[in-house]
Amino acid sequence: MNIETTITRAWQRQAAWLWLLLPVSWLYSLLMILRRQAYKAGIFSSYRAPIPVMVIGNITVGGSGKTPLIIALVRHLQQQGIKVGVISRGYGGDSSQMPALVNTESVPNIVGDEPCLIVNMTGVAMAVCPNRQQAMTTLLASYPDLQLIIADDGLQHYALQRDIEWIVVDAARGFGNKQLLPTGFLREPMSRLKGANVVYHQKADSLSSTDDKYDDTCPPTKRLRMHLQPDNLERLWSFDTQSDGLATVKAMAPEKGSRVHAVSGIGYPQRFFDTLDTLGFQVSPHPYPDHHDFSLTELLRYTEHPIIVTSKDAVKIRALLMQETINQTNQTNQTLSDEYNELGSRLWVLPVTAVLSDGCYEILQQQLQTLNIAISSKEHERVIT
């Protein structure tokens, strides 16, 4: 078990020994404050894009539902006729090949898994680079008519000036012991919520609730809500369509009550496991670190029962299987091993759709109008599909 996994599990349990790291958290807090003030004072230079920038981020380490929210917002803006683009760090990709534009042919080991997912789901114009300014200029060079840029996970990237900030909070996970790294899993103090719109990612039955324990951290007018709606299971890999008919494997989606392997390499895998449990599956959880690069050996380890993964993990696993298909067909004169065929028949992905409260769309429209970005006056849809 590596140190990342050890500390992540300690955060989840709120282990007592974490308080021994408090002096490190104090130092981290001091450096973070000095850094932010340096940007405010102009000691460190920051970049002002020629068009408005909307930052979507969080103040915690790990997943909060940020990517589904971005997909939902992009789709909504596209439906309103607004020309929107997205930039991202491209975590997990090859920084030596960045800045890079992302398209439906991009692969996660080059541009990152989340950018691949966002573009595959929306077709949005997107660029990736650890240097957000370079990502921005690359994107605008190819798409000069964009009206709005969404910066994925750029909340702490103060070198990029922004016009709108939305912070996503997982209300079920909360803030743990409410301490900064490494004692807790906060990137910034909870007071940071006061300066932005805060989207509370909640369970579906609490979407309209206003009674949550974090309400004192930001004004009521800035509190927004969303939840993730699971969709029908989809085949992750279909040999008859993805390997030129070299093999045909038919499979039925696992039924409620059946045992499944839940394999996840996301920031907060427990949410995924809980969702499958709520859907009625008997879940065998297999958590991996965020942005994990799965191997065929790891997947073959989970035998007998169906394997269900998230959309984000499916991006990498699909690329892995495509490469393995090429390797096997080249080596064995266009035949695939029985073991590989059997694995493909058991792989499923659980897509989710972000369902936003009406307040999200109302606030968004107000913010866009303030920035002189025209938006359709037609009635907003709460569920974006």
From Swiss-Prot:
Reactions the enzyme catalyzes: a lipid A disaccharide + ATP = a lipid IVA + ADP + H(+)
UniProt KW Nucleotide-binding keyword: yes
Pathway(s): Glycolipid biosynthesis; lipid IV(A) biosynthesis; lipid IV(A) from (3R)-3-hydroxytetradecanoyl-[acyl-carrier-protein] and UDP-N-acetyl-alpha-D-glucosamine: step 6/6
Keyword Lipid biosynthesis included in the entry's annotation: yes
GO terms assigned for molecular function: ATP binding; tetraacyldisaccharide 4'-kinase activity
GO cellular component: plasma membrane
Role description: Transfers the gamma-phosphate of ATP to the 4'-position of a tetraacyldisaccharide 1-phosphate intermediate (termed DS-1-P) to form tetraacyldisaccharide 1,4'-bis-phosphate (lipid IVA).
Matching HAMAP family: LpxK (MF_00409)
Family that this chain belongs to: Belongs to the LpxK family.
Name this protein carries in UniProt: Tetraacyldisaccharide 4'-kinase
The organism of origin for this protein: Psychrobacter arcticus (strain DSM 17307 / VKM B-2377 / 273-4)
